């Protein structure tokens, strides 16, 4: 299984934001220059091979990344684009002990979702991680 905590560590290792500024779940007091990693519940059927779930060799983890940066739109856009570019140019990937077959970016560029109530610019990147299932 590909866990959110492992994806959070992968995003942290990309060095766009400091490690303690990359989080999963909701934080009441988001720090500037942070990235949130959330499950993205977009519609998709489960991966099911003929013969049942145990015959499926891969699965999909849908993720939404929230880039919560600062009050400068240019700097915020630049940080979001830097993250997007690193994801787009990934050539080989293991997250934790899980081999990633490929990832699909679901948006053509980071999506500007405006500012939060404190005027901090935010961008969203939605993507799917296709990973090899490690069957016991």
Located regions from the model:
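Generic detector of contiguous secondary-structure segments
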Residues: 20-27, 66, 81-85
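Short, solvent-exposed beta-strand/turn "edge" segments of beta-rich domains on protein surfaces
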Residues: 52-57, 116-118
């Amino acid at each position: 299984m590909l866990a959110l905590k492992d994806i959070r560590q992968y995003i942290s290792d990309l060095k766009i934001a400091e490690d303690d500024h990359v989080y999963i779940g909701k934080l009441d007091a988001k720090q500037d220059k942070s990235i949130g990693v959330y499950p993205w519940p977009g519609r998709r059927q489960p991966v099911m091979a003929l013969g049942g779930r145990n015959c499926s060799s891969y699965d999909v983890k849908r993720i939404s990344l929230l880039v919560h940066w600062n009050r400068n739109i240019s700097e915020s856009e630049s940080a979001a684009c830097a993250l997007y570019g690193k994801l787009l140019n990934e050539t080989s990937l293991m997250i934790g002990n899980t081999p990633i077959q490929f990832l699909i970016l679901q948006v053509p560029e980071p999506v500007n979702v405006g500012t939060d109530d404190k005027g901090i610019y935010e961008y969203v990147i939605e993507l799917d991680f296709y990973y090899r299932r490690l069957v016991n």
